[in-house]
A protein has these predicted regions:
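Single conserved hydrophobic/aromatic residue that forms the stacking wall/gate
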Residues: 2-13
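Short, charge-rich binding segments
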Residues: 11-16, 43-49
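Structural motif
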Residues: 19-21
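Hydrophobic residues at beta-strand termini and immediately following loops
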Residues: 23, 56
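Active-site pre-Tyr helix/loop in NAD(P)-dependent dehydrogenases
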Residues: 26
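Mixed-charge interfacial surface used for oligomerization/domain docking
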Residues: 29-32, 36-42, 48-54, 60-70, ...
Length: 229
């Protein structure tokens, strides 16, 4: 994988002759960052043409990475230099929250965060967990709700109660085959706060395969990633 990543990064680096700003999955849930670091070092050793490669640990996954890329693009369009953009965007992950729930607890059990028995009983009782990214980029269980509607409403509450400067923010909603639920969450958010924009999308295949069908996440900037914990 590192060799393949190195070749791909090298092709972009040589062909486009541009600086590269790369947003990785949280390095505490994936080897993505370390693989990218190996690839970047190999590319620079092989064909350093004066262009820069900078890596940012998103402390997130899915749309958490995507929002960072969008904000970075907007900074560039405003005339900021590559290093100015990179230096600024590196401060964002510490405030970019990713909070999510899953449709079936068996997917949490597969990660080792629950036993199979607990997952089975939880599904029978319609227990819905809320998980979040910790300040260090680990996935931690945060709260529990009873029933699908209750957990969706709690995601809305967490976003609306912890978001900062919402009128200048883009918030993200990512889901795995839960489009109607995503529309409900967005509707409830808009009833409570005014935001600059909302992105509603499906999970990427990698994240989606880990969290399973009917999973749904919200992403937003807060003062930190603690959410009152």
């Amino acid at each position: 994988r590192d060799v393949e990543r190195s070749r791909g990064l090298g092709d972009v680096y040589k062909r486009q002759d541009k600086d590269i700003l790369y947003f990785s999955l949280s390095k505490n849930i994936s080897g993505n960052y370390n693989s990218a670091r190996v690839a970047a070092d190999a590319v620079l050793d092989d064909c350093n043409n004066g262009r820069k490669i900078r890596l940012v640990d998103s402390l997130n996954a899915s749309l958490g990475q995507g929002l960072l890329a969008i904000y970075a693009s907007e900074m560039r369009e405003k005339g900021m230099s590559f290093d100015e953009v990179a230096d600024t965007i590196e401060t964002y992950p510490a405030r970019l929250n990713g909070v999510f729930t899953v449709g079936n607890l068996k997917y949490i059990a597969r990660t080792g965060r629950l036993s199979g028995t607990t997952a089975l009983v939880g599904n029978m009782l319609s227990i819905k967990p809320i998980l979040r990214g910790s300040k260090d980029g680990y996935i931690v269980q945060f709260r529990k709700c009873r029933g699908r509607k209750a957990v969706l409403n709690e995601l809305v509450n967490l976003l609306c109660d912890n978001i900062t400067d919402p009128e200048n923010q883009i918030i993200g909603v990512a889901h795995a085959d839960a489009y109607e639920d995503s529309l409900y969450v967005i509707e409830q958010i808009k009833k409570r706060i005014k935001v600059r924009d909302v992105i509603n999308t499906t999970y990427d295949f990698c994240t989606g395969s880990h969290v399973g069908p009917e999973s749904l996440a919200v992403f937003f900037m807060g003062k930190d990633r603690e959410l009152g914990a």
